[in-house]
Amino acid sequence: VRRAAPAPEPRAGMLVCVCDPQLDAPANDNGPRAVSTFGLAVGFAFAVLAQTVASAALPLAGAQLAPRPELVTWPFAALLLGAALASFPASFLRDAFGRRTGFALGASVGIAGGALLVAALIQRQFAWACLGALWLGMAQGFSFFYRHEAAAASGRPAAATAGVLAGGLLAAVAGPTLASFAESLAAPFFLVGAAALAALAHTCSLGVAVMLADDPNSTFRPKVTAPLSAIVWPTLVAGIAWFGMNAVMSGAPLALVGCGIGGAAVFGFIALHVAAMYAPAVPLALAGDRLPPLAIALTGVVLVAIGVPLQRLATPESITAALICVGAGWSVATVGATAWIYQSGQPSRLALALHDGGLFALAICGALTGYLLA
């Protein structure tokens, strides 16, 4: 490294740059340890638990509180809107303050969102429910950066991404039992227990976030990043899967109720769907880097395309099959797209924010059309 020239004597109005352009911007929680995929997976698992119960509760809350039928899917759409809005701050706050602060902030917003949703259900306030769903979505948007954190820290981005997503499988399996128990404690207030469980799950996620390893200290290295154009095709391909999955997901609870399924039993169907979302990550964590990312992503899109028309058959069996297909397709497409954007090098924070923001924007469009499949 070239020795810097002696600094001149300070004078009034003199501007001094104290940052070496070859160094990463320091974060407030810098430290020497590397982050482990296991810690990221645990934090993501608690976020998935909150996502599971919120995804099942919000469509039913919309049906219960919406003043007009066309507004029924708005709380679920607000969940996705919050995730999209969080993409940019989640990406850039990581550099400004470090991973622990960023993930802790996201979990804190989720706690507030769950608490507000509890109040909305008790007071029967539709606007409050939408705002609570928005905050829960923001927490979800922050939590999806666990996969980027793992991919960036590993030389095997597909396997690392799948490893983090696999953490959601246990949360999905435990979700229905925990939701039923929470609902029994909150009886006779329908869905209040589920909303409180979402807030509690984010509280646990907050505890994990503050215990994550510090960010590594800044090191001297050339700034080599992938071009912004590298995210275009991965975002479009995965976005198709996100659109289809959320179109089915937002309409499924109401469709199941229309088939005679009880409201409490809907949590079991949604948990099966969420388990399908994260189960493919287990084999992909072992073999994902042996397969081309494009092939993985396209396989996910095909699975979603198979699942969407199944919901139109309007039977419990067909809706269940649709939920499984679109859940598995979403997982496979997301793993493939994440590995795809890392093929050209380390993506910039702007690229990651645009990628996740684009995915959630298409998910919102899918959620708003979900009532057509209900």
Positions of PLM-derived features:
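Helix-to-loop junctions at the C-terminal end of transmembrane segments
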Residues: 86-99, 183, 279-292
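Cytoplasmic helix-loop-helix junction between adjacent transmembrane helices
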Residues: 132-166
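Hydrophobic core of transmembrane alpha-helices in multi-pass small-molecule transporters
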Residues: 45, 126-143, 318-332
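C-terminal ends and interior cores of transmembrane alpha-helices
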Residues: 108-123, 303-314
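Intracellular juxtamembrane helix-capping segments at the cytosolic ends
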Residues: 58, 140-154, 332-345
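C-terminal membrane-cytosol helix-exit motif in multi-pass small-molecule transporters
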Residues: 179-181, 199-218
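A late C-terminal transmembrane helix in Major Facilitator Superfamily
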Residues: 347-374
